[in-house]
């Protein structure tokens, strides 16, 4: 399943990020890519050795960790260190698949269950640059407002189309979920959403408490932590 997570960053935060990223040191994006991805990748990334990068990636982590919808959809166990990329002048990233595991500075290794892209450019400010994701439901083309995030299974083939006008800047990361299976995670997300909707409409009740108990028992049964 693919999820649109709106408002991870406020417009004020996005503007500040963009201003700081204009001063960043950018390097060839292939430095963080395996052999397969390097053949089709043509973009730039913020140098991870810079002090600015360290500050910005911490802000992204704080923002997603405080976003209730992100937590409900991803049920995160481990988040990768966020990275930042830039596309301009027909730069693109052809179809590829993300690696199944990645190194992690604290945990050693993490499994990539979900991929996330946090858009930092106004979609009207550039042409092209759509994130295209192929999954069992077909092909999806994603180009979200600045500050919004998209979550999708890391097992999906995906690409970024050429940016033919303007500049596309984004942050991206991977998530190891407490729930490895996409279908089980999607069922828990739907159950959680319906519980919250019923609670807001009717208030607390024995039936809602029973559903909440079911949610947590399923999470207890399926989670890997």
Curated annotation (Swiss-Prot):
Keyword entries, A-Z: Dioxygenase, Iron, Metal-binding, Oxidoreductase, Vitamin C
A molecular-function term among this protein's GO annotations: iron ion binding
Entry keyword annotation includes Chaperone: no
Record-annotated Fe2OG dioxygenase domain positions: 78-177
Broadest EC class assigned to this enzyme: oxidoreductase
Keyword Metal-binding appears in the UniProt entry: yes
The protein's name in its UniProt record: PKHD-type hydroxylase YbiX
Encoding gene (name): ybiX
